[in-house]
Amino acid sequence: MTDSNQPMPLQARKSGALHGTARVPGDKSISHRALILGALAVGETRISGLLEGEDVINTAKAMRALGAKVERTGDCEWRVHGVGVAGFATPEAPLDFGNSGTGCRLAMGAVAGSPIVATFDGDASLRSRPMRRIVDPLELMGAKVVSSSEGGRLPLALQGARDPLPILYRTPVPSAQIKSAVLLAGLSAPGITTVIEAEASRDHTELMLQHFGATIVTEAEGAHGRKISLTGQPELRGAPVVVPADPSSAAFPMVAALVVPGSDIELTDVMTNPLRTGLITTLREMGASIEDSDVRGDAGEPMARFRVRGSKLKGVEVPPERAPSMIDEYLVLAVAAAFAEGTTVMRGLHELRVKESDRLEATAAMLRVNGVAVEIAGDDLIVEGKGHVPGGGVVATHMDHRIAMSALAMGLASDKPVTVDDTAFIATSFPDFVPMMQRLGAEFG
């Protein structure tokens, strides 16, 4: 697993203007779901543009261990021959998801609908993350889960339900992972499985279920929520999937281009699902020059080409209801806020505390060690932007790929270089990050 590797420190130095065109890797959320739904479908699923980072590769290995035929046919081109809903076989060994909470939690939902037993495990970071929020609804549906750790943490053994039950479930927090696990388990249950969320979370699972032939209905629920109803026991059919570029990965070169003066870059095929564009909305409110063109779509997911130019940013207040649409982007937004003029307040960030690290504390520490005034007030992050960042600090990444990439983006425009203690975990989501940024003009050493 990745956490057994030697640390790979790296320093980012003040760079000249960034220029060029790039395509960031395929979206991680779509890549996981394409593999899992391809494995649950009947027939062949061809996937192009799959993210070939460690997290997604571990999901591919897990689907193979569960009985699906999963093979790489070319550069980011994959083919899956599925086993059908409830058709998984008991794996011979534990399913190791490395650092991937998404792959692990979605696979738990998929396995919960098959009458098999599977053990789920991961690296030290994933073992520390809460799983009870996934386990609770799956147990209501008839699955049985045994964990030797407090809070239902990994490693755990999951026995899928022989006769899964449809449920109506209200998610305790806005979470696409909880919602998706319940819906994937609900594929094997007769009748209607319903998930109600008070704040709308990413809807990639719903869109892809429809693409594979499931009947799913989404309705508004309250001011910001959704009610999702799935008709169980469909025959999913294999379908082609084109994976758009990951907006969460595009966030790093995007913010780097905004804060490095004179930059002018283009990012192609970036997903523009409205439940993933909170960062772009916020950056534009801050005064960012971000233009989109060539808007199109595949499998229900829109994508576009973005032109991003160096901009003078101002502080803004980010409302808590925006969090689900940009939960993975707050770290790099904090970097933009540090270079802005004025105070930026990001509200309602409690979910950052249970990511690959406590990202709320880690973000504050990343800024403080580089001379930025920052405060945590409850679940709010307050950044005092001064138009520049002193830099000169060493950032502890805590085995978190997004902390590493955020800190490196910051170092490209800070007064003094910024060092990250370990870049190894960048490979989980963006293996080509450093060379791609160097092609745009970034200076690392």
Swiss-Prot record:
Active site, renumbered: D328 (proton acceptor)
An individual GO BP term: amino acid biosynthetic process
Segments for region (Disordered): 1-25
InterPro entries per the UniProt record, alphabetical: Enolpyruvate_Tfrase_dom (IPR001986), Enolpyruvate_Tfrase_sf (IPR036968), EPSP_synthase (IPR006264), EPSP_synthase_CS (IPR023193), RNA3'P_cycl/enolpyr_Trfase_a/b (IPR013792)
Residue numbers binding phosphoenolpyruvate: K28, G101, R129, Q177, R359, R402
The protein's Enzyme Commission number: 2.5.1.19
Keyword Transmembrane: no
Keyword annotations of the record: Amino-acid biosynthesis, Aromatic amino acid biosynthesis, Cytoplasm, Transferase
Transmembrane segments: none
UniProt superkingdom: Bacteria
Compartments in which it is found: Cytoplasm
HAMAP family with a match to the protein in the record: EPSP_synth
Protein name, UniProt field: 3-phosphoshikimate 1-carboxyvinyltransferase
Species of provenance: Rhodopseudomonas palustris (strain ATCC BAA-98 / CGA009)
Native organism taxonomy: Bacteria, Pseudomonadati, Pseudomonadota, Alphaproteobacteria, Hyphomicrobiales
